[in-house]
Amino acid sequence: MLDVNEFDKLRIGLATADDIRNWSYGEVKKPETINYRTLKPEKDGLFGEQIFGPTRDWECACGKYKRVRFKGIVCERCGVEVTKSRVRRERMGHIELAAPVTHIWFFKGVPSRLGYLLDIAPKDLEKVIYFAAYMVTKVDEEQRHQDLPDLQQEFDNEIANLEKRRNAEIEERAKKVEADLAELEAEGEAKGSARAKLRNSAEREMAAIRTRYDEQIQRLSAVFDRFKTLKPGDMEGDVDLWREMEDRYGDYFEGCMGAEAIKKRLQDFDLEAASKQLREEIDTGTGQRKARALKRLKVVNAFLTTGNKPEAMVLDVIPVIPPDLRPMVQLDGGRFATSDLNDLYRRVINRNNRLKRLIELGAPEIMLNNEKRMLQEAVDSLFDNGRRGRPVTGASNRPLKSLSDMLKGKQGRFRQNLLGKRVDYSGRSVIVVGPSLRMHQCGLPKPMALELFKPFVIKRLVDQGFAQNMKSAKRLVDRADSEVWGVLEEVISEHPVLLNRAPTLHRLGIQAFEPILVEGKAIHLPPLACAAFNADFDGDQMAVHLPLSAEAQAEARSLMMASDNILKPADGHTVTMPSQDMILGLYYLTTVIDGAKGQGRVFSSLEEAEMALDKHEIDMQAKVLIRLPQDFVLPKDWEPGEVKVVDPEPGSPDVVKEERFHDGSVLFATSYGRILFNGTLPVDYPFVNEQAPKKRLSKIVDDIATRYSTAQVAATLDALKDLGFTRAPWSGVSFAFSDVIQPPELDEYIEKYEGEADKVNENYEIGMLTEEERRQELVDLWTKCTSEVSEAVEEHFDSKNNLAIIVQSGARGNMMQINQIAGMRGLVANPKGEIIPRPVKSNYRKGLSVLEYFISQHGARKGLADTALRTAESGYLTRRLVDVSQDVIVREEDCGTKRGLTMKVGERDAEGNLHLVKAADGGPYSRLLAADVIDPADGETVLYKAGDALSMDVLNDLVAHGVEEVKARSVLTCESKRGVCAKCYGWSLATNKLVDVGEAVGIVAAQSIGEPGTQLTLRSFHSGGVASASDITQGLPRVTELFEARTPKGEAPIAEFAGVVKVEDTERGRQVTLKPDDDSVEPIVYPVTRRAPMLVKDGDHVEAGTQLIEGSVDPKKILRILGPRAAQVNIVEEVHTVYRSQGVDIHDKHIEVIVHQMLRRITVIDSGDTDLLPGELVDKARFKAANMEAVKNGGKPAAGRPELMGITKASLATDSWLSAASFQETTRVLTEAALNQKVDDLKGLKENVIIGKLIPAGTGLARYRNATVEPDKAIRDTIYPNFGLGGEGTDSSFGDTDLSDVDFSNIDFGDLKLGDDFNPDDFLDDNGGQTDLGDTL
C-alpha cells in the first residue's frame, strides 16, 4: 500500500477507460454475490476471489494452497492468488459496458460541464442521452458542398415528378367524374342532388390526393432543407424525418442517440478553436452572451491546460470498488444484510448482460435503444441515486445509497471516517469531583487504568520477573493479582493521559493530566479544571485517551498539562478561577467583622497569633495587630493607622496604632484569616489587606498570571482551592427559608404603582394616549417599581445574612434572583421577546397566582426551546469558521511589512482627562508596534520602538504620557504568502509570549468566536419604542450575517460620494438626496422610513462612506466605496459589538483572522497578458505572482477587484479540493476539481488529517520533524522532581542506578562479538558505579 509520507501533493483528475482497466484486477461479469449454500463468493461475481483476492489469509478458494509459504502463487485450479485477505479492501474490478454511458456528475451537475463544453442546453442534452433525440456527430461538408448542385437537381426532379404524378392522378379522377355524370344523364337520372353528391365525393377524393402528395413534397423539402444546413451538434427529435434523411443522405453525415453520440462529439471537439472563438466573443460581446462565453471558456480552458480528455466524461468501463468497502454480512436468521451498492452494481450488470445478448441476437434498434437507456439510468443510480428522476428504492421504499451518498454529508466517508476516526487506547466514564487533586492530576479508576495501560503493565510484569512470558502476564492482568496493582502504579507514574469532554468547543476541551489510581468506576476531575471543560457533576461523562509514543507524551506534558493551560486563548484572562465553595471560604477568611472577639489585640509574631486562635482567644475575622518580619511585602499605599480595642483591660488604651520599627519589621493591622489567605499567594506578592469577593479574587489571579511563571500560578491556584474548601465549612453558611427576608413596605410599593397604572389606563380609555404610548408608560412604570423594590430588598439583607453572604461573595446567584425570591418578579417577556405590560407582582417566597405563573412560563419555555436551537446554530457557525480558517498557521517569524492598523489606546472623559480605552485588552493589547511611539510632550523622545509588545503595563504607560493612538501590526496587514507571520499576530493570549511558528491560529480564532456562540441570543429584538428603527438583528443571527457577508436586514444606506444632503418628507415616507460636489455625477436618492433615526441633518456636508441613518451597513458597499481595509475593520468592530453586548470578551485578532480569509480573493476584471481568465476568482498571492511574471516579461498586468466572500463561499473556494469536498457540496467540488485536475498541496490541517499525515502545525511542521530530544539533567530534575531521575538518594526503579544488580555475563549482545579479554567489571568504577565506556568494545 502507498505510504502517506511518500508524497507531498495529491491530484484528482478524469479517469480514462484505460486507467480504470489498469486499476482493475479483473472484469466482473456476473451479478451474483455469494453462493447461499457454500457461502463462498461466486466466480466472476461481485465478490469473486479471482478478482478481489482471497477471503482468508494465505489461502486460495479451493484450499489447494494454504499457509504463508505459498505467498504470491496463483492457484492453477481456482485462479486465486495466495495473499492476505486485506487486499479485498484495496483491489478494484471493472465492468466492460456494451454501450457507452455519460457520467452523471458532468452532465447533471450545476452548471452542466458537458452542456457548457458542447454549447448545448441541458434539456437538449438530456434528450440525446436518454434516447429521445438524435444528434449529428459528423458532416462531410466538402462532399456535400461538391454534390449539392446534383442533389438539388435530383431533389427538384423528384419534386417535379411528384407534382406530375399528383396532377395526373387528379386529372384522371376529374375525367372519371365527367364520365360518371355523362352516364347518369344517359340513364335519365339527372337529378340535381345525385349529381351534387357525385361531384362532392370526387372533390373530396381529389383533395385527399392533393394533400397526400403535398405532404410528401413538404416532407421531402423539410428533409432536404434540414440536410442542407446540417452541422455537427445539431439535434433532431423527429424520428421519421431523421430516418428519411439517413436513407437519402446517409453518406454525407453521421449521427446517433445516447452517450455514443456525445462521445463522438467529444472526440472530434477542437478545444483550441473553441478557446480562440470564445476569447473573441469575450472581447467583443456584452451582457448575457459575454457571461456565457466566460463560463464556457473556463470549462474549455480546463481541458486545454490539464491534459484531461473530454471523452473521459463518457464511460465505456466502470470501476467496481473493493468488496470489503461494500460488505455482505450474514444475520442471525440466515438472512443477509448487504450494502446498497451491491444492489446498484447488480442492476448495472444485469442490464449490461441483457444488452450484450440483444446486440448478439441483432435485435431491432428500438429495443436496443430502450436497453441502452436503462443501462444509462442504472449507471446514473450507481453514481448518484436520485440526481435525475425518481431514485431507485430498496425494501420499504428507502432510496439506495449510491457512491455519491457514501461521500456526502455527516455520515459520508469524509466526515464520518476520515475526519472522525475512532481511537484505540481510550475509555469513558462518569466524572466526580476530586477536591484533593492538584491541578495537573486526575483520578483514574483502577479497572480503567489497567485496561488502558495493559501492554505497558504486561511488559513490566515480564521485565520484573512476575511472569515468564506475555501469555502468563496477560493471565495475571486478567485475574488482577495483587502484584499487578503495584506495577500499574509504577507504569502510570509520569505517564500523562488526555481528558476530553464533549462538546469540545475550544482547545481547552482536551487537556493532559497525571493519573492517580482511585477506587470505584468514576473519573475524578480537579475542581479548577471544570471551567475550561464547562463540566459539572450532574452526570457528565468524559473520555480518556492515552498518548503512547515518547514524543506524544512529551508533547502532552509540555503543551497540554492542565497546570499550563491557565489562560483562555480567546481573551487572555484566567480560565482556572476558584469558584463556588472555594470563593465562599476565601470570602469568609478575608472578611473582617467589627467588634469580633480579640479585636485590637497585639501579637509579636504570626506564631503567637496562631496560638491565640487555637485557644479561641481571638476570632478568625477579628482585626488584630501582628508584628510582621521586614521581608514582608506590604500593600503599595500602606500608611500606619489605628485600630479600636474591644473590651480593653482597665488602664489599657482603647486604640492601638500600627507602626514601622527600626529593624524594618512592622506592626500591621489585619485579621488572621487574611494572613492565611495571603499565605497562599506568592511570597513576594504585595499583601492583600481587603475583603476578597469573586471580582477582587479574579483581579488578583489575573495579576499573578501576568507577573509569575505558570508553575507558580498553578501552585497559587491549588493553594487557594485547598484553603477555600477547608475554610468554607468554618463559615457555617447554609440557607433556610428564614433567610429570605421580604421587605415590609413591599405591599405599599405595589399599591402605590397600581394607582399610577390605573391613571394611565384611564387616560388611555378617554383617548389621551395611544395603545403604543400606554404600553410604554406601563412598562416604564413597573420597571421603576421593580427597581425600587429591589433596592428595598437589598437594604433589608444585612451582611450577616447567609443568602446575602452567598450573593455578595460571588459564590452563586445575584441580587436579581434574590429580588425574584424576596421582592417581586416584575415584568416578563412573551415568546416574541416583547415585554408584557402586566407585571408579576408576587415573589417566589409568597408564590405566584395562576395567571402570573402562566405568563412567566410562556416566555421561559420559549427560552429553553431557543437554547436548544441556538446550540445547533452555534455549532454550525463554529464548523464554518474552522473550515474557512483551518489553514491559517503561523508560517514565518516576520513578513517584513511596515504596514499596520491605527488603534486608539486612550480616550478622554467629560473633564478632558485621558483614560485607557475600555476594550484595550481586546484591541491593542498583545500586539507589536508597527511604528515608533513618540512622546507627544516633546515630539522627539521615542517612548517605545517598532516591534515592542503592547502589554497592559505599556498601554497604561502610553496613556500616562498622553498618547491617544498607536500604529500596531495586525493580521489584516500581514504580507505572508500563506498563513500569517508571528509578528503581525503578536502574543499568543494563552501564554502571553510571542506566538510560536507553527501555531494553528486560525483554528484558535474559530474556536474563540464559536465557543461563546451559545451564549448569544437568537432573537431579533423589537425595541418597543416609537422612534426606533425597524427590528435590528442582534445576537447569533447578526454574527452569522456579518461572517456570511450578507446584506443586513433593514440596511442603512451610506453616502456613495462626498456631497450635500437634502432630507425631505414624501407621501410614502422620507427620502435623502445626496447632491455630489462633482457636478459630472448624478445625485442619488435614498428612500428611508420615517421611523428611522437620522444620523445627518438637512444641508449637512458628508464625506464618501458616511452612514445616513441608524442601522446596519452592508460591508460589500463599504468595500466598494471605502476599500478593503475599511470593510475589514467594520466587520471586526460589528462582531465585537455583538459579543460585548452579551458580556463576552474576545480579542479582535481572532475576528481579524477570519476577516482576513474573507478578503483573500480577487475577481479578475481584465486578464492583461497573464494566464488568468476574466471573471475568475483567484487568491491574492496567485494574482500578485501572475502580474509580476507578466511585468517581468514586458506584458500588461491583470486588473481585478477585491471580493468579500462569506465564510461558506470562502471555504468552498479554498485551493485545497480535499478540504472543500469534506466541507459541503462534496459532489460539486469533486466534479470541479477533477475537471481542472486540481493539485492539493496538503498545506492545511484538514487535508492532512484526511490522508492520515501529521498536520503541518505545531510540532508537525517540517522544521520540527527531525528534531532529536537531548536529555538535560538540570531541566529533567525540575520537570520530574518526584520521579527520581538522577535525583539524590532516590530508589526509583526508573532512576539512576549503580548497575550492581545487573549480571552482564548473561546479556545477549546479538551479533556483537565480545573479545576474549572482556570483563564486565571493567565497566564499573570502584564504588560499583558506571564508568565511561571509552573504546572498550
UniProtKB/Swiss-Prot annotation:
Domain of life: Bacteria
Family matches, as InterPro entries: DNA-dir_RpoC_beta_prime, DNA-dir_RpoC_beta_prime_bact, RNA_pol_asu, RNA_pol_N, RNA_pol_Rpb1_1, RNA_pol_Rpb1_3, RNA_pol_Rpb1_3_sf, RNA_pol_Rpb1_4
Gene Ontology molecular-function annotations: DNA binding; DNA-directed RNA polymerase activity; magnesium ion binding; zinc ion binding
Residues reported in the UniProt entry to bind Zn(2+) 2: 895, 974, 981, 984
Keyword Zinc appears in the UniProt entry: yes
Keyword field: DNA-directed RNA polymerase, Magnesium, Metal-binding, Nucleotidyltransferase, Transcription, Transferase, Zinc
Record GO biological process: DNA-templated transcription
Catalytic activity from the UniProt record: RNA(n) + a ribonucleoside 5'-triphosphate = RNA(n+1) + diphosphate
Positions that bind Mg(2+): 536, 538, 540
Cofactor: Mg(2+); Zn(2+)
Cofactor note: Binds 1 Mg(2+) ion per subunit. Binds 2 Zn(2+) ions per subunit.
Subunit architecture: The RNAP catalytic core consists of 2 alpha, 1 beta, 1 beta' and 1 omega subunit. When a sigma factor is associated with the core the holoenzyme is formed, which can initiate transcription.
Family annotation (PANTHER family): DNA-DIRECTED RNA POLYMERASE, DNA-DIRECTED RNA POLYMERASE SUBUNIT BETA
Name of the featured protein: DNA-directed RNA polymerase subunit beta'
Species annotation: Bifidobacterium adolescentis (strain ATCC 15703 / DSM 20083 / NCTC 11814 / E194a)
Gene name of the encoded protein: rpoC
